[in-house]
From Swiss-Prot:
Keyword Cell inner membrane among record annotations: no
GO biological process, one term: L-leucine biosynthetic process
Protein's UniProt name: 3-isopropylmalate dehydratase small subunit
Organism: Clostridium acetobutylicum (strain ATCC 824 / DSM 792 / JCM 1419 / IAM 19013 / LMG 5710 / NBRC 13948 / NRRL B-527 / VKM B-1787 / 2291 / W)
Molecular functions per Gene Ontology: 3-isopropylmalate dehydratase activity
Family, per entry: Belongs to the LeuD family. LeuD type 2 subfamily.
Gene responsible for this protein: leuD
Self-association and partners: Heterodimer of LeuC and LeuD.
């Protein structure tokens, strides 16, 4: 499981209210949520984003309200993964449950800048900043989490009888 994309970098404490503002929670349709992804933080986010790009954040990414809409929104917008120094635990678990890969790697975040090109190998836990020609080691996902992501979420795994 590998992805590559350009970095869109943000800071610490990116909460679920700026990932998907509460005023748009009248729907659970991923494509509708995606239209408003990060708009309260960066009004040009969707203009900057190319499918497959990687969001890089600081500490406590996904803090705030416990809403599954936040990782659904980011995934539906076309972001391939999020790399952060740390994640709010409920955001982390919600992301895995919907099959959206996220990694914690403080060194990679410290060195990355918006526009850098990254390659991410989730099986090995390797993040390569192609722009800087640097490689970082994150904690790879255990097999059961890889299974969830490969099958686009926990619900699909259960439907297929994998768990």
């Amino acid at each position: 499981m590998k992805v590559n994309g350009d970095v869109l970098k943000y800071g610490d404490n990116i909460d679920t209210d700026v990932i998907i503002p509460a005023r748009y929670l009248n729907t659970s349709v991923p494509e509708e949520l995606a239209k408003h992804c990060m708009e309260d933080l960066d009004v040009d986010f969707l203009k900057k984003l190319k499918t497959g790009d990687i969001v890089v954040g600081g500490r406590n990414f996904g803090c705030g309200s416990s809403r599954e809409h936040a990782p659904i929104c980011i995934k539906a917008a076309g972001v391939s993964c999020v790399i952060a120094k740390s994640f709010a635990r409920i955001f982390y678990r919600n992301s895995i449950n919907i099959g959206f890969p996220i990694l914690e790697c403080e060194e990679a975040v410290n060195d990355a800048s918006t526009g850098d090109k990254l390659e991410v190998d989730f099986i090995e836990g390797i993040i390569k900043n192609v722009t800087l020609n640097k490689e970082y080691k994150a904690q790879p996902f255990p097999d059961f989490m890889l299974k969830i992501m490969k099958n686009e979420g926990l619900t699909n795994c259960v439907k297929k009888g994998l768990f």
